[in-house]
């Protein structure tokens, strides 16, 4: 403190400790020591420069830590207090002290108000340091000027705390009560009693301040006057003479990554041109990537171009910008009409030779099919609609439309470009199109599609191999009539759904959500590979039943999302999963109901039909297959059931769509099922309702769809009609008799009203069923299962669990997906299992240990109202099953139609008939109690893959977890990593309070950031809640419900929150006594409930998500994945355990949340990197068929869409990354935007922008190189000149420079024949444009353009100039005297450059261009030629 009284610092710093720029009026600091800087900023004699203060707080972290800085400010403040209090007689000295005090106060207030999230929130020590200073014990003795300053800082601190933590109670006094504020003592969040911070959590403001570059940039600009226009410095003195040798190509294309400019490197894959050549001059290698910059939503949402063929060419004329546009042979009419997928294209017609809705696309020429773009389309469509070879080829064409994969179809539809070169009448076009020579297409766009299709093809091949092993070479057959009848209905539904990206909620960087599609396909491929490897390894051992089969079965059951299955006495119909176009955004926006995942079954032929008469079971011993976890972008396989005719064993089958890189293997079935067990299983299934089957035959992994409610209703009525024709009376009778027997035994054994069992119709082989499965957004898993058995009685006769077998865990240990904890959990709980159940339920015997605990029987059957007005009597037994059913995602029709939330997990495990649903009493009770608050829960986990469709989104499992006390069932098996139980457990640990709070509306309403958007209002949530309540209101007796809900449940082992949190900490151990005796765990539950609250309040596990609406989720996956790497910051102190808060270090959070994602990302990148072109139509030897797609569009449209893309990418650059120059000096070597998309999580915003810039330059050069004729080259070059001219008008300097650099490249300049043909007007424009990147006077032309921008037009700045300046400036020293005198000028120059950049990026918000998804997709998903191909074509 004494330092501020020394003569070098009092009253202002002397030239010994500070120096100023001599030639500037504002006297900016050139160099200074740290105390002198503080004195300068709080100078009592000079005017206050608020801009200089704001700049200081942006850059000080480069030379002093926040803690040291605030210590200095506190010392300065206390020095001022001493000056005021000890110099009462010296008026002048006292006056100087007062002015310095106020100015120091301004600095502290600025820091608290604007950098609370960045500096204080992650640093508990700093927070406590400042709180200690503000809680000054002597505040009452100070003069009012001092106490007023301190009280003002206290108020600011309270304000910021409330801004950062929602619902925090600080008990601060009234704002005007001066005396109360004098005595008010601040407390840190961690020092509050748990009562006062209950329900609090990090706010949207806090999260965006961490993770959203755009929000952070806006916050910085808000510190300055809006009238300020920052300018780039005209002069930059670099200490390195290499600056004089720089050239534009050096700046933009460092040798190591450019495809076009690298002459000495042999690369198998072309690398991205890197704009940061200047940065390679700087020897400072930045080792870590930015954790803040992310791909913006605009780019990510861009649709793939639908066709890779050029539609039209615009005519070049002597006048500028008169363009001749190619007519498109491939613009599907349904693209604009939103009606269907590819049926408007030539794809299906080329396969079935039938007339098509697009007359121009018709073709009957096989040469077209094989040699032209149409052949490629046919190949891709076949890939989407992969069918088993045993299918009757005659009906392939009818099947196609129903099985297509909408997101892949849309990708092809939007990206593909096919054109005709000459303007003709439509009839002439049609005739010419039949000649394959005239059909030209954009080969580069087609390569982008083929890159994804190759993944899809690989997946199909793997499925085929897995099925071959599983089916033991059994060739399933298909009942053609049934299939045909089914497809007629399918096609009708298909016409109602269409994939169309939203114009409001999309990411221009990935408008077709390709990142999500590719991620899910890649996950599927990885899982299938693991499955296949395990199958091959275990082939011989699988010949005998494994001793740990029971444990494995239990694990599989736990992985099931739905426990429904459909049995037809001994006959499983072969099923063909149909893909419906689920992309009609219009049909989605009207309902909030969850998507329906539909499967349709067709039947096997007569060989199977014979078995219909006898209710025997079949064995499904195929290995468990883990398919793609595509949230919406993937389809399930057409899997036919494999069952040897003479086998009567029971088995559980499941297909897990897992994002986990490892897939569990399956083990062989066992023959331990009693006859009675089979009977029970036959009885319990009601086949009137939609059911789910696992299939092993068909090869299309992607054939599932999400249906809207309307189409499902129509389908149900259709199916009901069809089913009536196939009723089998004989089976009905035998079914009914066994039902009665079972009822008697149930009454005798359990005393429970467990009447879930209803008579069911029997159907012959021509059944038409809707198959449903649950998609779990939180984990990105889709699980399909046939449940092994149902726990409805505690009778030992049903037991199929052998404790002796379960003692062996050899097979389980091989399954790397299972955590050691879960293994322990599994082994111990299995030993205590006295029920046959391996489904997720609590056995009756465990629920009701005594007659006293059993519920009273209902005297009346509860009534259930249905939308059609009918009231259906429910069975009068209590539902004990708590298996997660399809109902947990697909709510009842009446609740969907009211837009309400989905039902709880405690719904009936048996599929309901269309007009009847059995309601769990506990569920009914809890609905009433909790007001269905949980309906606001949505996607939660960091690792989540967005499963939303274009405008619809699935409810989260945690919705039901809140209501389901019995969801965690230790006595039935382990909670598997891949299981929904595990997912819900994780979600509960993150988002639910301890049990005592779950019945309170307020504390139970835990919204995640996914659910809250900035614009979200509580009224919307209240409306949803009201809908839910009205939808679920039933006529059940509340008193009886109350009794049932309050019954003891002895089967719960631990508080699930406790278990989850202990697992998170690695301290969980299963209590080694019987699961029934669980009271010993109560103490642990109480002890850790505080921890659960803290985790919830701070939301440590789910920091990086901000979207809430389904439409927002449409674009969020890419952004969410990028954001998720940002916030690995500890928000709570390790040392505050005495307050009941344990450590939540970033390591723990990071490990639990991000390890999986990192492993997956690396595997996906490797998969994409393995792509090689095999199709001759896509090779450069076929360049005579190439026409760039830009010739199909006018240059104005192309410029607008390119501007939207660049705007979003530059919006991902964070001011701090730019200031610190956080970037790689060697960009990734990629040849397509897809390859960049899958790497985006590892790239900072700067790296992403540079890579995109270089990719675009390479793409422009590649388009010109691939074009064969000089005339066509001329057209392409002219079109790019026109686009560049429009970009200059739009002030989109990034795209402008991309085009200029590409056209200026030596490769393009070689084509003198083409340049000679260019129109004079366009040559004049080109002469003007190519002066812009001139090196004269330090890029003065581009600097003048950037400094003279009109903000209202919008602006996309040329990032390379800024990076060049920052790199040159980085060569200066940080310190003039090491750790004493800082080179302040260096940092001040940096901040001026950064402010200029982020200001111009913010001006891009003034663009009002309309999105053209087809063109945007083509512009986003670009590919380039490889290094070798460029060399070959340019020589």
Swiss-Prot record:
GO terms for molecular function: guanyl-nucleotide exchange factor activity. It is found in: Cytoplasm; Bud. Transmembrane segments: none annotated. SMART domains: RasGEF, RasGEFN. This is Guanine nucleotide exchange factor LTE1. Keywords: Cell cycle, Cell division, Cytoplasm, Guanine-nucleotide releasing factor, Mitosis, Phosphoprotein. Residues 621-632 have a biased composition (Polar residues). The keyword tRNA processing does not apply. It holds the Pfam family RasGEF_N. Phosphorylated by CDC28 in a cell cycle-dependent manner and in response to nocodazole. Dephosphorylion by CDC14 triggers LTE1 release from bud cortex during the exit of mitosis. Residues 237-249, 654-667 have a biased composition (Low complexity).
């Amino acid at each position: 403190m004494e330092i501020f009284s020394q003569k070098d610092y009092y009253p202002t710093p002397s030239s010994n400790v500070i120096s100023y720029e001599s030639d500037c009026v504002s006297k900016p600091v050139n160099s200074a020591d740290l105390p002198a800087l503080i004195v300068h900023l709080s100078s009592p004699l000079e005017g206050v420069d608020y801009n200089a203060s704001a700049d200081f707080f942006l850059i000080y972290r480069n030379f002093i830590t926040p803690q040291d800085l605030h210590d200095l400010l506190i010392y300065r403040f206390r020095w001022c207090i001493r000056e005021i209090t000890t110099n009462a007689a010296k008026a002048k000295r006292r006056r100087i002290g007062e002015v310095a005090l106020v100015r120091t106060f301004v600095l502290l207030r600025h820091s608290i108000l604007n950098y609370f999230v960045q500096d204080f929130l992650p640093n508990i020590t700093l927070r406590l340091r400042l709180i200690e200073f503000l809680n000054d014990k002597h505040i009452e003795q100070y003069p009012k000027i001092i106490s007023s300053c301190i009280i003002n800082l206290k108020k600011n601190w309270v304000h910021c705390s409330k801004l950062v933590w929602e619902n925090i109670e600080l008990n601060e006094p009234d704002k005007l009560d001066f005396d109360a504020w004098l005595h008010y003592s601040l407390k840190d969040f961690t020092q509050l009693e748990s009562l006062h911070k209950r329900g609090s959590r990090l706010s949207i403001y806090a999260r965006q301040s961490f993770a959203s570059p755009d929000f952070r940039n806006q916050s910085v600009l808000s510190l300055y006057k809006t009238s300020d226009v920052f300018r780039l410095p005209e002069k930059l003195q670099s200490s390195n003479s290499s600056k004089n040798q720089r050239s534009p190509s050096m700046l933009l294309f460092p040798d190591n990554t450019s495809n076009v400019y690298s002459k000495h490197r042999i690369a198998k894959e072309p690398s991205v041109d890197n704009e940061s050549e200047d940065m390679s001059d700087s020897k400072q290698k930045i080792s870590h990537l930015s954790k803040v910059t992310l791909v913006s939503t605009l780019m990510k949402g861009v649709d793939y171009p639908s066709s890779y063929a050029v539609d039209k060419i615009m005519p070049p004329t002597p006048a500028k910008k008169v363009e001749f546009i190619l007519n498109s042979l491939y613009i599907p009419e349904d693209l604009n009409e939103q009606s269907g997928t590819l049926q408007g294209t030539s794809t299906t017609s080329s396969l079935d030779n039938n007339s098509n809705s697009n007359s121009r696309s018709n073709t009957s020429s096989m040469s077209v099919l094989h040699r032209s773009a149409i052949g490629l389309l046919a190949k891709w469509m076949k890939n989407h609609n992969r069918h088993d070879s045993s299918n009757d080829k005659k009906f392939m064409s009818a099947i196609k439309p129903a099985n297509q994969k909408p997101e892949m179809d849309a990708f092809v539809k939007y990206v593909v470009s096919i054109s005709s070169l000459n303007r003709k009448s439509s009839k002439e076009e049609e005739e010419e199109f039949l000649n394959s020579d005239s059909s030209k297409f954009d080969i580069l766009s087609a390569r982008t599609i083929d890159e994804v299709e190759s993944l899809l093809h690989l997946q199909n091949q793997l499925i085929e191999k897995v099925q071959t092993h599983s089916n033991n070479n059994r060739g399933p057959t298909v009942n053609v009539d049934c299939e045909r009848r089914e497809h007629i209905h399918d096609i009708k539904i298909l016409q109602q759904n269409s994939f169309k990206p939203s114009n409001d909620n999309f990411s221009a960087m990935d408008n077709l959500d390709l990142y999500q599609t590719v991620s899910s396909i890649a996950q599927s491929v990885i899982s299938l590979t693991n499955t296949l490897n395990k199958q091959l390894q275990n082939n011989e051992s699988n010949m005998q039943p494994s001793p740990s089969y029971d444990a494995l079965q239990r694990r599989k059951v736990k992985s099931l999302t739905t426990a429904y299955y459909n049995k037809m006495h001994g006959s499983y119909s072969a099923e063909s999963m149909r893909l419906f176009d689920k992309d009609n955004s219009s049909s989605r926006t009207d309902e909030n109901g969850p998507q329906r995942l539909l499967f349709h079954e067709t039947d096997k032929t007569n060989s199977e039909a014979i078995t219909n008469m006898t209710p025997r079971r079949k064995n499904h011993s195929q290995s468990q297959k883990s398919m793609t976890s595509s949230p919406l972008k993937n389809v399930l396989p057409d899997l036919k059931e494999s069952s040897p005719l003479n086998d009567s064993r029971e088995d559980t089958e499941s297909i897990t769509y897992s994002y986990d890189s490892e897939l569990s293997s399956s083990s062989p079935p066992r023959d331990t099922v009693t006859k009675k067990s089979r009977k029970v299983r036959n009885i319990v299934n009601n086949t009137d309702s939609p059911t789910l089957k696992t299939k092993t035959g068909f090869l299309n992994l992607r054939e599932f769809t999400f249906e809207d409610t309307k189409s499902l209703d129509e389908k149900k009525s259709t199916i009901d009609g069809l089913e009536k024709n196939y009723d089998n009376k004989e089976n009905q009778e035998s079914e009914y008799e066994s039902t009665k027997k079972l009822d008697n035994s149930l009454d005798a054994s359990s005393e429970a009203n467990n009447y879930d069992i209803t008579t069911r119709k029997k159907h012959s082989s021509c059944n038409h069923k809707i198959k449903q499965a649950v998609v779990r957004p939180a984990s990105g898993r889709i699980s399909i299962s046939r449940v092994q058995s149902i726990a409805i009685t505690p009778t030992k006769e049903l037991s199929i669990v052998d404790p002796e077998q379960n003692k062996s865990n050899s097979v389980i240990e091989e399954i790397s997906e299972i955590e050691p904890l879960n293994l322990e959990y599994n082994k111990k709980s299995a030993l205590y299992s006295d029920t046959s159940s391996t489904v997720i339920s609590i056995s009756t015997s465990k629920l009701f240990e005594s007659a006293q605990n059993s519920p009273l029987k209902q005297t009346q059957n509860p009534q259930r109202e249905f939308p059609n007005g009918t009231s259906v009597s429910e069975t009068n037994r209590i539902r004990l099953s708590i298996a997660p059913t399809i109902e947990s995602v697909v709510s009842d029709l009446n609740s969907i139609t009211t837009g309400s939330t989905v039902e709880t997990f405690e719904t009936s495990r048996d599929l309901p008939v269309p007009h009847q649903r059995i309601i769990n009493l506990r569920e009914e009770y809890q609905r009433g109690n909790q007001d269905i608050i949980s309906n606001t829960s949505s996607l939660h986990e960091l690792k989540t893959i967005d499963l939303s469709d274009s405008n619809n989104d699935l409810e989260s499992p945690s919705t039901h977890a809140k209501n389901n006390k019995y969801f965690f069932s230790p006595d039935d098996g382990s909670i598997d990593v891949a299981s929904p139980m595990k997912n819900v457990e994780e979600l509960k640990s993150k988002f639910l309070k301890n049990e005592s709070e779950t019945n309170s509306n307020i504390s139970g309403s835990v919204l995640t950031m996914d659910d809250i958007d900035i614009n979200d209002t509580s009224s919307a949530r209240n409306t949803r809640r009201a809908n839910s309540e009205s939808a679920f209101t039933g006529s059940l007796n509340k008193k009886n419900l109350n009794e049932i809900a309050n019954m003891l449940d002895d089967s719960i082992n631990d508080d699930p929150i406790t278990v989850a949190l202990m697992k998170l900490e690695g301290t969980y151990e299963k209590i080694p006594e019987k699961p029934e005796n669980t009271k010993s765990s109560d103490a642990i539950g109480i002890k850790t409930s505080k921890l659960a609250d803290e985790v919830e309040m701070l939301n440590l596990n789910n920091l990086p998500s901000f979207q809430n609406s389904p439409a927002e989720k449409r674009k969020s996956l890419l952004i969410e994945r990028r954001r998720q790497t940002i916030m690995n910051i500890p928000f709570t102190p390790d040392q505050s355990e005495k307050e009941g808060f344990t450590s939540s270090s970033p390591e723990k959070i990071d490990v639990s949340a991000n390890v999986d994602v990192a492993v997956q990302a690396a595997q996906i990148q490797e998969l994409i990197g393995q792509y090689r072109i095999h199709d001759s139509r896509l090779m450069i030897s076929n360049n005579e068929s190439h026409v760039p797609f830009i010739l199909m569009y006018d240059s104005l449209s192309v410029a607008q869409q390119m501007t939207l893309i660049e705007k979003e990418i530059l919006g991902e650059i964070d001011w701090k990354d730019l200031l610190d120059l956080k970037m790689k000096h060697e960009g990734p070597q990629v040849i397509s935007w897809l390859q960049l998309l899958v790497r985006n999580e590892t790239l900072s915003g700067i790296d992403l922008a540079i890579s995109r810039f270089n990719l675009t330059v390479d793409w422009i050069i590649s388009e010109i190189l691939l074009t064969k004729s000089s005339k066509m080259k001329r057209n392409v070059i002219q079109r790019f000149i026109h686009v560049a001219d429009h970009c200059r008008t739009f002030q989109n300097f990034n795209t402008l420079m991309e085009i200029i650099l590409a056209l200026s490249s030596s490769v393009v300049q070689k084509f003198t024949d083409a340049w000679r043909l260019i129109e004079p007007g366009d040559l004049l424009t080109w002469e003007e444009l190519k002066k812009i990147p001139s090196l004269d006077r330090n890029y003065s032309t581009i600097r003048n353009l950037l400094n003279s921008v009109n903000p209202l037009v919008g602006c996309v700045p040329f990032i390379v100039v800024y990076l060049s300046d920052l790199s040159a400036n980085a060569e200066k020293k940080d310190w003039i005297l090491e750790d004493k005198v800082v080179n302040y000028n260096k940092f001040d120059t940096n901040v001026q450059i950064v402010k200029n950049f982020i200001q111009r990026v913010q001006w891009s918000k003034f663009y009002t261009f309309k999105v053209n998804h087809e063109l945007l997709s083509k512009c986003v998903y670009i590919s380039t030629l490889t290094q070798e191909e460029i060399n070959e074509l340019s020589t």
